[in-house]
């Protein structure tokens, strides 16, 4: 199943790019802490900490830092992991399946090979229309787009 086959949901925000990079390199950048730190936050923000256990039920913690030093942690769990093809994660739970105070989204990232290229799709499914609108107003397309550029640049060097 490709990302295009997934049913659209009214509360989805989606970014899709056809990249001249093999899927395995993109997947590494999404799963290896040292690589995540190099691309996951839109510049001038940075990633100060990554702690992840990439398996279904495994935890994820990524802390982004503003240029002024403000830290913004994002934690959750992986729901589905298909190496080099698909990652599904949510912030509805934290480590140990503890319910989060305020769930915001579920991320579905796919890496679909197309010849020598990869169709990269980041789909963010929100719990409700208000959360979707808030994320879009925060700059989803600009921020995730910039991060995708940073991801592609890093993956091309691997």
PLM regions: where:
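Hydrophobic/aromatic beta-strand elements that line small-molecule binding cavities or substrate pockets
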Residues: 17, 49-52, 74-80, 104-113
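Hydrophobic ligand-binding cavity/cleft-lining segments
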Residues: 1-46
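Helix-adjacent hinge/juxtasegments
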Residues: 59-90
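Short beta-edge strand/loop motif at the mouth of beta-sheet-based domains
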Residues: 14-15, 34-71
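A short, structured loop/turn motif at beta-sheet edges
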Residues: 23-24, 53-55, 79-86, 110-119
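A conserved amphipathic terminal alpha-helix motif
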Residues: 127-158
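Hydrophobic pocket/interface hotspot
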Residues: 26, 36, 60, 78, ...
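Short, solvent-exposed aromatic-acidic interface loops
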Residues: 92-96, 123-130
């Amino acid at each position: 199943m490709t990302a295009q086959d997934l049913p659209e949901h009214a509360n989805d925000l989606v970014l899709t790019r056809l990249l001249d990079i093999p899927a395995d390199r993109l997947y590494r950048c999404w799963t290896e802490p040292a690589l995540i730190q190099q691309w996951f936050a839109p510049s001038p923000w940075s990633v100060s900490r990554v702690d992840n256990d990439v398996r279904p039920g495994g935890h994820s913690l990524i802390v982004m830092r503003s240029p002024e030093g403000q830290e913004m942690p994002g934690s959750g769990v992986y729901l589905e992991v298909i190496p080099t093809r698909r990652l599904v994660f949510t912030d509805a739970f934290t480590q140990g399946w503890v319910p989060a105070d305020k769930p915001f989204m579920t991320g579905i990232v796919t890496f679909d090979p197309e010849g020598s290229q990869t169709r990269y799709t980041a789909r963010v499914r929100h719990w409700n229309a208000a959360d979707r609108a808030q994320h879009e107003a925060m700059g989803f397309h600009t921020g995730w787009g910039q991060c995708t550029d940073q991801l592609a640049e890093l993956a091309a060097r691997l």
